[in-house]
């Protein structure tokens, strides 16, 4: 190698000497070899010179090595935190810090190529990192709690996101209109930033909720809101960007609302139809005999919903979210047992890696993006505006939900009891405060900010980036303390996860087939791992008794019927039990609105989309209860 370099230099010297001999007026100087670092080499920091393929491959390898090292550090930190039972700090916060430290080192180092390679790329984010998170969220969605709290979720997600975007947009527009920092943006751009900063991403908080086993109702409301909120924020942002450079008129509001509703509805329909298509393919073919091919096809077809929707100028996130929900509701029960387990863990694995990569990217972006323009006052105003907007979106809407709940319950109970009843709030104040605290922003906002147009693009991008990092660190880092301060109910779900193979979903159904029992259970697509645990002994006893009175939750509470007359003996805890029973009764009344869809689903849709006897049930019916116990270990 050294001899080649020396020969190359000697050849160039001879060539230059001969050239000067022919043309002595030529003042060209000897140029360094491309293989050797010179003043124009990217190693020395000149960004205008292209690398040769070998050097480019070397720098790309170093960039990937750094990213993988950060990812390994984040996952190892997660293991350490889990082992030491440190639940106040989450790995996502550490991922941001790791990214910030390495980003600062890269920024201070000579050269630019590694810095350019690890810079946040919106195309990578939307096409590679975000889809696994959305798909897993829809697939792992607790459908029972989601549909039971659908009203609260929809109110927070749709009107709440709209209120948040409008409040943030108006505050930023007024601030920039004052001209204190020489920034002048249009109202459409201000609304675009408002939509960007309205995209919540409570990954950190929900992970802490899982560790503390927070009340599933609160978890579902925050989780469901964040799912729909991201999709709605993206649709709102794209709608606002269509009015960039145009004067804001009153008719623009109705035009924007129409575009939003059309985009959301068509995207939802695309996702549901593709999910149903997968269910029908699994039902009418024998692909389940080849689990590896089956798992690959399910994953790829699900991804197709995302890219097809984006290609049609719709929302890929909405399509992928509802495709995941439909896959779990219908296609799951047509899969082979191996594919059920494989798909579950593939989705979880990809989502976990993507989440950590995203937070590492956020930390790196603070220092590796050289074009960012930081305006401290604008950042402070933006941070205050998201708090004001979150307050306007949470507390008034919570009171509205409580009012609807109260009116409906009083009307429903008026025929049962003639006396006035005190209806508990559907969303108590401490739950409202926790929902407010869970409104931290995430990488979706940063990725959307990369699409902002105009002269002040990098100023607004820097503002969004700093606000996102601050909310993750401040709100995410103080969540554990807020759970104690607000006295949020924890420990609602057993620590033991006995559903790794998901045999707990189908084992009771197999017992019914073996014993010829006609007991109807809720262990179907509307149930999940958070459903009441039913043991074999309870199953045998409940055949001669009222089943709801014999099912106990992991927390020790019992579900009683409306005509419950047992246990009339004095009990110190009787009053608290009565309150819980009353709340269960009221909840049953309030959630009865979704019963029509469940009946329609059971009687019409499932016979069309599902096998009469799913393959999983066929496999489990040939085994004894002891076999299920042995396979779970």
UniProtKB/Swiss-Prot annotation:
The subcellular location is: Endosome membrane; Prevacuolar compartment membrane
Transmembrane stretches, start-end:
62-82, 86-106, 118-138, 153-173, 190-211, 218-238, 259-279, 289-308, 314-333, 345-364, 377-397, 432-452, 458-478
Q: Could you tell me which residues carry Phosphoserine? A: 494, 499, 569
The cross-references to InterPro entries, in alphabetical order and at most eight, read: Cation/H_exchanger_CPA1, Cation/H_exchanger_TM, NaH_exchanger
Q: Name one GO biological process term.
A: potassium ion transmembrane transport
| Alphabetical keyword list | Antiport, Endosome, Glycoprotein, Ion transport, Membrane, Phosphoprotein, Potassium, Potassium transport, Signal, Sodium, Sodium transport, Transmembrane, Transmembrane helix, Transport
Give the positions annotated as glycosylation sites.
Answer: 420, 515, 550, 563
What's the effect of swapping residue 201 to N? Impairs protein-trafficking to the vacuole
Q: Please verify whether the record's keywords include Nucleotide-binding.
A: no
Name the membrane topology term: Multi-pass membrane protein
**Hey, what's the signal peptide range on this chain?**
1-21
Q: Could you say what the effect of mutating residue 355 to Q is? A: Impairs partially resistance to osmotic stress and hygromycin
Q: Which GO terms describe its cellular component?
A: early endosome; endoplasmic reticulum; endosome membrane; fungal-type vacuole membrane; late endosome; trans-Golgi network
State whether it acts alone or in a complex, and with which partners, per the record: Interacts with CYP6.
Role according to the record: Endosomal/prevacuolar electroneutral Na(+)/H(+) exchanger which mediates intracellular sequestration of Na(+) cations, regulates vacuolar pH and contributes to osmotolerance following sudden exposure to hyperosmotic media. Also contributes to the postdiauxic/stationary phase resistance to osmotic stress and allows for the continued growth of cells until the acquired osmotolerance response can occur. Involved in hygromycin resistance probably through its influence on the electrochemical proton gradient affecting secondarily the entrance of hygromycin.
In its miscellaneous comment, the UniProt entry states: Present with 521 molecules/cell in log phase SD medium.
By what name is this protein known? Endosomal/prevacuolar sodium/hydrogen exchanger
Species of the source: Saccharomyces cerevisiae (strain ATCC 204508 / S288c)
Q: What is the lineage of its organism?
A: Eukaryota, Fungi, Dikarya, Ascomycota, Saccharomycotina
Q: What gene does this protein come from?
A: NHX1
